[in-house]
Amino acid sequence: MTTTHLMTPARPGLADLLDGIREQTRRGLDPRRTALAVADVLRAGMPGPDLLTDEERRGDADELISHLLHAESAFSVKALIWEPGQLTSIHDHIAWCAFGVMQGVEYETLYRDDGDHLTEIGRVANQVSDVSGFAPPGDIHRVHNTGDVTAISLHVYGADLSDSAVTIRREYDLPVR
């Protein structure tokens, strides 16, 4: 995954969202409740794809593109650009996450770790304006752009990603039952 650092405090459409996220992260809730509270902030003020420039909205058929839009000690905001057919490994995350779809559809498959195998526990087709939040443990998933247009999503992670853009804690190579 290629990540660019595009942090600009004056980015139109992001300031109010950052204020709302900051308010929720300062409440001292547990990670799951923080993720759900931040998801509510996204749901109320989800920007459109025009948050990004034309250049930033371009994907790469060979790899998932990620733009770090903002980072501070309590959270970071990234935009992910998914070309048709792109998918992640089955993975979980280093911290809570809330995300919303700005363009396209992201198909998400959810899993449970049963020791020697994974069990599929759900599937969701996240459409434009759909928002979700989750926190470890229990955040094992795979995301796939099954559509024929570029998908763009905005992700808020409960970690400072300014020094490391890595959000994946673990990738799973277990059989799925």
Regions found by a protein language model. Give the residues of each.
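Short beta-strand His + acidic residue motifs that chelate non-heme Fe in jelly-roll/DSBH
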Residues: 89-91, 108-109, 134-135, 140-146
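Glycine- and acidic-residue-biased ligand/ion/polar-headgroup-sensing regions
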Residues: 95-112
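Short acidic-glycine-tyrosine-enriched beta hairpin
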Residues: 113-140
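A short hydrophobic beta-strand segment most commonly corresponding to one strand
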Residues: 98-100, 148-164
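Domain-scale activation on soluble regions of proteins
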Residues: 156, 163-170, 175-177
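A short glycine-rich, His/Asp/Glu-containing loop-to-beta-strand
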Residues: 54-86, 131
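N-terminal leader/capping segments at the start of a protein or of a new domain
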Residues: 1-47
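A short, structured loop/turn motif at beta-sheet edges
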Residues: 126, 146-149
